Each structure stands twice: as C-alpha cells, then as structure tokens.
C-alpha cells in the first residue's frame, strides 16, 4: 500500500490492523517529520474508512431487526462518553 493513502478496498479487520501498525510507527518517534505526516494522513484515511464501514454495517443490522410490520426495534446505544 502506498504510504499516506488508505486502501479503501481493505476489510474492516485489515484496516484496523494497518491502523495499529501506523500508530505503533508514530509512537516510536523514529520517523522523520515528513514520514510522520504521511503516516498520520494514512491513519486518518483508515479511521474514516473504518467509520464508513461501521455505518454501513449498522444500517444493515437496522434493516435486519425491523419487525414484520415495518417498525424498527431500536434500543438506545450507550457509550462510555455519554453520547
């Protein structure tokens, strides 16, 4: 994969794996400023890609849990941040 660009054909799991690699590389502090910026840009692209995939999966799950009369059974999601 080209540095600085997220591969949008990656599975969610592969994208998370690559994101973990990017984070480890940035945490070492051994990359040059230019390389760090490229890694950061790649990481942002991977995060956006993963978020998009999760949104799509959430929509699919929502369709699957609709009741036969067309009403959706939705439970409020709770997060640690109180969103």
From Swiss-Prot:
Transmembrane segments: none annotated. The keyword Ribosomal protein does not apply. One of its GO terms (molecular function) is exodeoxyribonuclease VII activity. It is an enzyme of class 3 (hydrolase). It is found in: Cytoplasm. Disulfide bonds: none annotated. One of its GO terms (biological process) is DNA catabolic process. Keywords: Cytoplasm, Exonuclease, Hydrolase, Nuclease. It catalyses: Exonucleolytic cleavage in either 5'- to 3'- or 3'- to 5'-direction to yield nucleoside 5'-phosphates. Its EC number is 3.1.11.6. GO terms for cellular component: cytosol; exodeoxyribonuclease VII complex. The keyword Transmembrane helix does not apply. Its main location: cytoplasm. Heterooligomer composed of large and small subunits. Bidirectionally degrades single-stranded DNA into large acid-insoluble oligonucleotides, which are then degraded further into small acid-soluble oligonucleotides. PANTHER family: EXODEOXYRIBONUCLEASE 7 SMALL SUBUNIT. Belongs to the XseB family. This is Exodeoxyribonuclease 7 small subunit. It comes from Heliobacterium modesticaldum (strain ATCC 51547 / Ice1). The lineage of its organism: Bacteria, Bacillati, Bacillota, Clostridia, Eubacteriales. The gene is xseB.
């Amino acid at each position: 994969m080209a540095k600085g660009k997220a591969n949008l054909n990656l599975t969610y799991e592969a994208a998370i794996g690559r994101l973990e690699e990017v984070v480890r590389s940035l945490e070492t502090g051994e990359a040059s400023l230019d390389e760090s910026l490229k890694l950061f840009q790649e990481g942002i692209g991977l995060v956006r890609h993963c978020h998009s995939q999760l949104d799509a999966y959430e929509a699919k799950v929502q369709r699957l849990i609709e009741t036969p009369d067309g009403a959706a059974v939705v439970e409020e999601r709770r997060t640690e941040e109180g969103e």
